[in-house]
């Protein structure tokens, strides 16, 4: 099915039973151990459309703040709201103040998604991938109404 997925996306915590489908989405087999550990430890969320896992995100921390370490969306579901749903679910479950993510400077789709969802550039990290700096993004999360400072 090639229709728009945005109204049928369900985001939930990944379970060990999701692991095969999650790993099949990632085109980088060198990350299999890291992704497997994220699933088992409860740091991975999956996006489902019509009961098919079509994306996942891995949560971590960055200098004590919530950090979206990895976002992967099935190629046939890109630009249909799956990535945005995963990011928004991450932000809504994150701690107060701010959340971070990063991507290579060459990853124009992810950079556009970050900017569309209210993230701003916080800086760059050189020399992780030669000639392709890592761009770090931050999104300030407003405090819940009635929350104490």
What are these regions (language model features)?
Residues 45-48, 135-140:
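Short beta-strand element of the conserved SAM-dependent methyltransferase core
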Residues 93-105:
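Conserved GNAT acetyl-CoA-binding A-motif
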Residues 100-102, 120-136:
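Conserved catalytic-core motifs of GNAT/GCN5-like acyltransferases
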Residues 108-126:
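Conserved N-terminal glycine/acidic-rich loop preference
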